[in-house]
Amino acid sequence: MGARGRRRDRRLVGIGIVVPHIRPGVAQLAFLHVSDGFRGTGIGRRLSNELDRIARSAGDTTMVVSATPSESTVGFYRRRGFEPTASPLPELLELEPEDVHLEKRL
């Protein structure tokens, strides 16, 4: 597992967690959050890029994420290269059946 955070004025304003190898060659972006007031400042993009590097360095070639089905959340992930998948991992679909399941090549 890899985690990264961002601080502003000693306050944690963004955090992300990636879980490498949930399947052979597949990492899961398990958590990504940027605090209100700091969204749109590039923090999420930088965290996402760092988590991509962690997954790639672990040998994964695909990243999956289960996203809250809001336009802004799905839009963020699509701008990061994710696309909706027609075949989400069953274990993620079971945990988050209402989410939008996306994946991208690393």
Residue positions per predicted region:
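Short glycine/proline-centered loop/turn elements that form peptide/ligand docking sites
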Residues: G44, S48, P69-T73, P90-E96
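Flexible loop residues that form catalytic
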Residues: V18, G37, T68, T85-P90
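Exposed loop/turn and edge beta-strand positions of beta-sandwich/beta-sheet ligand-binding modules
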Residues: R23, Q28, G59, E96-E98
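Acetyl-CoA-dependent GNAT
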Residues: M1-V26, A30, S35, S48, ...
